[in-house]
């Protein structure tokens, strides 16, 4: 793959990342698929940066500027602002669902109550899995 092809691919992937980040509304609970997409794209772009640093000519200042701008975007906008809010939202969702499940009367349950409880458990499982996925990203941050 030529340097130009690599830069073009990088630009495309970074644009996807920017779009995903700009679509986030942290005031609302984020759907799991949106969270996974964002972290996948962040990881993808960060990996591309590492590969590109090794493969692109050091004298190419436009490349270094793009990389620097991208690293700043990830660090200042995502890692410092968005990532902590996502972690907080996930933790709050887990707490809320857990409280809802604990408040359900464990005695005589109607079919509807049992179905609602099952849905809450499924949602709790999904969010807890997402939290583990996001924590892996968090671990990577602390290793940098």
Give the label of every model feature segment.
Residues 2-7, 11, 15-142:
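Long, low-complexity or tandemly repetitive, helically biased scaffold regions used
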């Amino acid at each position: 793959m030529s340097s130009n092809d690599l830069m073009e691919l990088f630009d495309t992937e970074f644009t996807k990342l920017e779009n995903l980040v700009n679509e986030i509304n942290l005031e609302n609970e984020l759907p799991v698929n949106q969270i996974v997409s964002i972290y996948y794209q962040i990881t993808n772009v960060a990996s591309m940066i590492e590969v590109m640093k090794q493969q692109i000519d050091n004298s190419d200042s436009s490349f270094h500027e793009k990389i620097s701008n991208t690293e700043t975007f990830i660090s200042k906008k995502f890692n410092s602002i968005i990532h902590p809010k996502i972690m907080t939202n996930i933790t709050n969702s887990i707490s809320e669902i857990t409280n809802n499940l604990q408040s359900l009367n464990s005695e005589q349950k109607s079919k509807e109550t049992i179905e609602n409880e099952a849905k809450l458990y499924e949602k709790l499982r999904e969010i807890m899995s997402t939290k583990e996925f996001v924590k892996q990203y968090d671990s990577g941050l602390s290793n940098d």
